[in-house]
Amino acid sequence: EIENIWNGLKPPYVDLIKWLKNQGKYPKVEISETFHTMMLANSINLKKDAVKINPNDYLAEYKWDGIRIQISCKNNNTKIFSRTGEDISHSFPEILINSKKLLVLDGELLAGKDFTPFPFGILQKRLNKKSPSKKLLISNPVFVRLYDILFYNELDIRDLSIIERKKFLEKFFLSISENKYFDLSKIIKFSDFKVLNNIYLNCSESNFIEGLMLKKKNSCYIAGRKK
């Protein structure tokens, strides 16, 4: 509960302390300023676990070698959070969204140009830079490969299936004009797990792919790691 409001609170955290002591109500914060706990994955062994699941119930995507981020925007104010909820907006000033209504996106921040990834080391040079120079922005460009969407035009869609959320994500993506920084994660088509395993084995580090993600088609967006 604290994680969900932390970024919207300011020192000396009077309301938070009162709530923790049961002396006040749960603090209210501007939702666009807050971090929403991300949905995390569990590792599986395709050979071992494939017999337990129906491939028709799942979609697959590549897991890229970047950093997982959440982007929140309202009233044209863009916030970028790391997987742990740290506000890293200042390190990536070029990643902006123009939206009056609340949008919350989930994706992978990658170093790269024209949506072609660069080595992770190039991205590392951008991390923890509070005021990156124009030279650094040019020499170490970045973009976001979008996986999911949590809020669309103020609407909380986390309870919808991933299939339905992907439709909203595509709608957002198509609404962006002159887009240089946002790309959609590719859906991998597969007929069975043998095919998917072959795709996995062909994942190349030279293409900056860490592996594959399986997502159940009817799954809603659940915070944390569900077992």
Question: Where are each of the predicted segments found?
Answer:
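Short, intrinsically disordered, charge-balanced linker/junction segments flanking boundaries
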Residues: 94-95, 223-227
